[in-house]
Amino acid sequence: GRHFSEKGYNVLIPYMRATGESEGEYIGMGWLDKDDLKCWIDLIIKQNNNSNIILHGSSMGAATVLMASGDELPSNVKAIIEDSGYTSVWDIFASEAKARFNLPAFPVLNMFEIVANFRAKYDIKEASALEQVKKATVPILFIHGDNDDFVPEYMCEKLYEAANCKKDKLIIHSAGHTESRYKEPETYYNKIFEFLSDIK
């Protein structure tokens, strides 16, 4: 948040549900969190109706802002910046099951889907950033490291291609998962503020 506050932005960094000091029993992988995010947006607007809001998230936070992008957002939301977001909950779990444990998506994910439906009350097949960005109207900046071994770079490419809104993309060479801002901080933040200056 420091780079944003230095540019004069007010910064809000909430814990996502069931993480840090936030309440909740189940991590929503972005799908449940997008509704929490909209509550934060509404709270900001209630305090200042003229607020211009930028949504910025990394990893699961990136999935959250992408999943929110396809919902009806207030006109105060001016841009979305996502760093290392995944296409869907199903896709990231399938990718990890294969990469980490050499397990097939079926029947592992199908069993997980039943548990998620029962316990957390959401369908992991429905929880798709890819489907949401197709409906997005707010400009989106997609950022990814080409050495990400958790969320593969191809997911960023698919998300970028699916988005019909104003968009841009930054791929940082040799950066792992959410490492882009540390690998090339000047490039990273210059791109963000250049992107934001174009949409004000």
Ranges and model annotations:
Residues 27-48:
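Alpha/beta-hydrolase active-site loop
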Residues 47-59:
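Alpha/beta-hydrolase fold nucleophile elbow
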Residues 135-137, 142-144, 148:
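Short beta-strand/loop motif that positions the catalytic acidic residue
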Residues 129, 138, 152-161:
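Short alpha-helix in the alpha/beta-hydrolase fold that links the catalytic acid
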Residues 67-123:
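Hydrolase active-site cap/lid region
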Residues 183-200:
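Catalytic active-site module of serine/aspartate enzymes centered on a nucleophile-bearing elbow/loop
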Residues 1-23:
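Conserved alpha/beta-hydrolase
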Residues 160-178, 185:
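Catalytic histidine neighborhood in serine/cysteine hydrolases
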